[in-house]
């Protein structure tokens, strides 16, 4: 195996501050910091996206031991609304520095930073792995554009990767349909930063802010897109025989919000459905702790970080079987799995948890402990180290073979 430490380059379109872009920025941040803590020399090349209106602060200094290099996009609007990242200077930087790394790890598909990196690394003879994290197969938003990108300039990114990381069997299945050979797929789950959950709030501040007292609280936390199934959740909530219950739909609105609001009004739920917007940091943890149950009725969800974080906050969850979330919850316990697109089943599962609140809270706490053992950052990064070493050993063997 390759000796440690390694010089590892991570290329990701969005990083630490880009909560509005979903789970990948947070996962990449957790992963790179954990690798740095384990003694590796970790560099991140990323862009300056943050949200629809603002950019991340530029920095070229270490972040928790990680050397983060941000490259400004030509247009923040194009990056946010079309996921078209145009980082000034990144391509030249990659051409100049690719050969200085032992291995690289690229995050997300259908983006220019990844294509630039794959091209430069291949030219430099440096192996790389790719973590699509659910982005390999175009399933929502600009599907035709993503397919065209994948068939043209993006095609080589997966094709020339030494390994493709699947975070669940569900994602491995997606990759298989795209022609990625099973032998090229490494099954490694997403990491959680367990240190973030050392002190869990009691949820009192979140409830006080909403003015809901001790009323039953159902929470959805995530991006508002059609794929997340929030419409099914609203219908399921309307079927609950709990007129005092409240539904909190928290997350960055990527276009589905107006439809959710209209549905709530049509069901006479507008006074019981609250949309506080994107929650980050401690506010997110307070919301997860305040909830009696977290519902995540998404489809094509290859992992699902939110249900896992709910368990770490001691809150039971309901997820759908059409996703990697179901794999996670079946491994940890602490929640129920229901058929996707079935509001009645979702409603019954939420009611079951609300009726047996103490039992499910105890199960959620136990599941959170299991989650730490299975998905803790050090555990997952140990698996990544083994993957990197295997790739480098194969790469060295290939270079020794006669032409």
Model-flagged regions — what are they?
Residues 331, 336-343, 352-357:
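Conserved acidic donor-binding segment of nucleotide-sugar-dependent glycosyltransferases
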Residues 26, 216-239, 344:
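A conserved mid-protein helix/loop that constitutes part of the nucleotide-sugar donor-binding site
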Residues 48, 170, 191:
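Carbohydrate-associated surface elements
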Residues 192, 221, 246-261, 277:
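Glycosyltransferase donor-sugar binding loop
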Residues 259-279:
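Nucleotide-activated donor-binding/catalytic signature segment of Leloir-type glycosyltransferases, i.e.
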Residues 316-320:
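Short hydrophobic beta-strand element within catalytic cores of glycosyltransferases
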Residues 299:
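Aromatic "clamp/platform" in nucleotide-sugar-dependent glycosyltransferases that forms part
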Residues 127-129, 137-160:
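Nucleotide-sugar donor phosphate/pyrophosphate-binding loop at the beta->alpha transition
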């Amino acid at each position: 195996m390759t000796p440690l430490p390694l010089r590892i380059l991570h290329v990701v379109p969005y990083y630490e501050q880009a909560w509005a872009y979903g789970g990948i920025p947070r996962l990449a941040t957790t992963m790179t910091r954990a690798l740095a803590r384990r003694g590796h020399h970790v560099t991140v090349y990323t862009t300056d996206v943050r949200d629809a209106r603002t950019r991340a602060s530029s920095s070229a200094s270490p972040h928790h031991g990680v050397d983060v290099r941000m490259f400004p996009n030509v247009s923040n609007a194009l990056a946010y609304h079309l996921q078209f990242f145009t980082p000034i200077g990144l391509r030249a930087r990659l051409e100049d520095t690719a050969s200085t790394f032992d291995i690289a790890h690229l995050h997300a598909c259908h983006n220019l930073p990844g294509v630039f990196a794959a091209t430069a690394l291949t030219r430099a003879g440096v192996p790389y792995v790719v973590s699509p994290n659910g982005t390999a197969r175009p399933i929502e938003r600009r599907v035709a554009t993503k397919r065209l990108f994948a068939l043209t300039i993006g095609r080589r990114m997966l094709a020339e990767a030494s390994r493709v990381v699947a975070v669940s069997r569900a994602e491995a299945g997606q990759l298989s349909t795209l022609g990625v050979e099973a032998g090229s797929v490494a099954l490694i789950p997403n990491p959680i930063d367990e240190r973030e959950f050392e002190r869990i709030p009691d949820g009192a501040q979140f409830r006080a802010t909403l003015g809901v007292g001790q009323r039953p609280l159902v929470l959805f936390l995530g991006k508002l897109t059609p794929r997340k199934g929030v419409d099914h959740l609203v219908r399921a909530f309307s079927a609950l025989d709990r007129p005092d219950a409240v539904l909190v739909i928290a997350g960055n609105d990527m276009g589905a919000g107006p439809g959710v609001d209209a549905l709530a009004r049509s069901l006479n739920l507008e006074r019981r459905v609250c949309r506080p917007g994107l929650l980050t940091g401690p506010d997110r943890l307070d919301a997860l702790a305040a909830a009696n149950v977290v519902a995540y009725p998404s489809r094509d969800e290859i992992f699902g970080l939110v249900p896992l974080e709910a368990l770490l906050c001691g809150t039971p969850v309901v997820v759908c079987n059409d996703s990697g979330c179901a794999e996670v919850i079946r491994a940890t316990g602490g929640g129920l799995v229901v058929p996707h697109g079935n509001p009645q089943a979702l409603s019954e599962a939420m009611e079951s948890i609300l009726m047996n609140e103490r039992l499910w809270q105890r199960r959620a706490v136990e599941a959170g402990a299991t989650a730490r053992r299975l998905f803790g950052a050090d555990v997952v990064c140990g698996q990544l180290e083994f993957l990197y070493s295997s790739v480098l050993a194969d790469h060295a063997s290939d270079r020794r073979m006669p032409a």
